[in-house]
Design a protein with these regions (language model features):
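Kelch-like beta-propeller repeat domains
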Residues: 2-14, 21-22, 35-396
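A short, compositionally biased N-terminal segment around positions ~18-40 that is enriched
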Residues: 23-28
Length: 396
């Protein structure tokens, strides 16, 4: 567990976020501090990431939920839990900086496979599906957890990707179910801080299960599956290498492609790097451990690989670490992965203590110094599956 030091400022205790010492005329960052107690060195401060433990479980176990942050809360909304995880839930769980859980106003429409992101003082929960119906619903939560709705997506869909650039939150790709068939989508909807929706240039191909993130002045979307499929997000067909970038004026440009096709991967920004990690390559039929980095000029490089090849992982950036947790790596009792890898601003990888339960289809959100990984599904043994309500907490 990470340790903290507090200093008195204006009669209030303020947490020290960083500490430096002078060495050879240069400021060097302190990673750990110790104090002597009873003749022994005791750790009193750590700037390194670690596992904190678990928080109060979700109010209901579920998979394919969405997580993000607003005000002083980490929010986890929606999800599914029936025999095939297609039926949606409207639950909204909120965790404060003390990791106390409350229940906020429910989503206006019960759904799973939705996408969430924070834009200014609002948390947006967008799209999703329940059964064979897709939704374009946009639920908005403010810092007091009051829920309103914004203009719907231009096309109802689930399994889209999100990223923020400038004053816009972009929602790209996804797939639409209408009860008869499923169609992947290329639409990119942009919402500004006034929650006005505009339509940006579409992606070059119809895709779902792509990944999105922000670096420099760009929102970047990569990969995804081009195949029209109503299958689960375990082994997608038609994965792609495409990478598309949008600047703050919503101008679209092409970036260097991924090194290989991938879908159901995850993205996180750390420092000047946007990382795309894991996924499934339908061309080779292999799960991926590859981590690709895009800098502010959209130059692509590779980082140290994940400790396990997998897709369906969750990601979060907390402190100076981008974390990738959980996932799925094949049809076996050991397919549901518990590993957690953390990358610092130098892209040095640290393997963290495992999740309490290996699982897939989990969601993440950050509150204060904590990254929370919630929900998902695990395989117990043989044909037995278990939907999860566990919330693992990592600190930095």
């Amino acid at each position: 567990m990470a340790k903290a030091v507090y200093v008195g400022v204006g009669s209030k205790a303020r947490k020290m976020k960083k500490a430096y010492v002078g060495i050879g005329g240069k400021a060097r960052k302190v990673k750990k501090m110790y104090i002597g107690i009873g003749g022994k060195a005791r750790l009193c401060y750590s700037a390194e990431a670690d596992k904190f433990g678990t928080a109060t479980p979700l109010s209901k176990y579920r998979i394919f939920l969405a997580g993000t942050t607003v005000g002083g809360y980490a929010l986890f909304g929606g999800g599914g839990y029936d025999s095939d995880a297609r039926k949606g839930e409207a639950i909204m769980d909120a965790y404060n900086a003390s990791l106390t859980r409350t229940t906020a106003a429910s989503l206006s429409v019960a759904r799973q496979g939705l996408t969430a992101i924070t834009l200014g003082n609002h948390a947006l929960f967008v799209g999703g599906r329940s059964g064979d119906t897709s939704f374009g619903t946009v639920d908005v939560y403010d810092a007091s957890l009051t829920r309103t709705t914004a203009t719907e997506l231009s096309i109802a869909r689930c399994d889209s990707a999100a990223a923020v650039v400038g004053s816009y939150a972009l929602f790209a790709g996804g797939r639409r179910n209408n009860g008869l068939f499923t169609m992947s989508q290329s639409a990119v909807d942009a919402y500004n801080t006034s929650l006005t929706r505009t339509t940006a240039t579409p992606l070059p191909s119809n895709v779902y299960a792509c990944a999105g993130g922000t670096v420099g002045g760009y929102a970047v979307f990569s990969g995804g599956s081009s195949m029209n499929s109503d299958s689960t997000l375990v082994e997608t067909i038609g994965a792609m290498e495409m990478v598309r970038a949008y600047d703050s004026s919503l101008t679209s440009s092409k970036a260097a492609p991924l090194s290989c096709p991938r879908a159901v991967h995850s993205a996180a920004t750390i420092g000047n790097h946007l990382l795309f990690a894991g996924g499934y390559n339908s061309t080779t039929g292999k799960y991926l451990s590859t981590v690709e980095s895009y800098d502010a000029s959209l130059t692509r490089s590779t980082a140290v690989e994940l400790s396990s090849a997998k897709n369906g992982l969750a990601s979060a950036t907390v402190g100076e670490y981008a974390m990738f947790a959980g996932g799925y790596k094949g049809n076996s009792d050991a397919a549901y992965v518990a590993t957690v890898d953390a990358y610092n601003t130098a892209l040095t990888k640290t393997t963290m203590p495992d999740l309490s339960v290996g699982r897939y289809g989990l969601a993440s959100a950050v509150i204060g110094d904590y990254a929370l990984f919630a929900g998902g599904i695990s395989k117990i043994q043989g044909p037995a599956y278990k939907y999860q309500d566990v919330v693992d907490v990592y600190s930095a």
